[in-house]
Amino acid sequence: FLGTINLSLCEEERDADEEERRDEPDESNVEVKKRFFFLSRIFGK
């Protein structure tokens, strides 16, 4: 169950990243990495 939520969240982050990347690639990439790291820490336990 948690794995499914984690996958769906990652897909949403990826979609958002692709949209933001057109504007400012460096900043959006760092933001997504931070969010992914935070989510992986939450769901990794």
Curated annotation (Swiss-Prot):
Per the record, residues carrying Phenylalanine amide are F43
Leader sequence segment: 1-10
What applied role does this protein play in biotech? Has potential application in preventing biofilm formation on medical devices, since it has the ability to prevent methicillin-resistant S.aureus biofilm formation on the polyethylene terephthalate (PET) surface, which is widely used in making prosthetic heart valves cuffs and other bio devices.
Main location as per UniProt:
secreted
Location(s) in or outside the cell: Secreted; Target cell membrane
Any one GO CC term of this protein is: extracellular region
Q: Which GO terms describe its biological process?
A: defense response to bacterium; innate immune response; killing of cells of another organism
- What family does this chain come from, according to its entry? Belongs to the frog skin active peptide (FSAP) family. Temporin subfamily.
**What is the recorded name of this protein?**
Temporin-SHf
Source organism per entry reads: Pelophylax saharicus (Sahara frog)
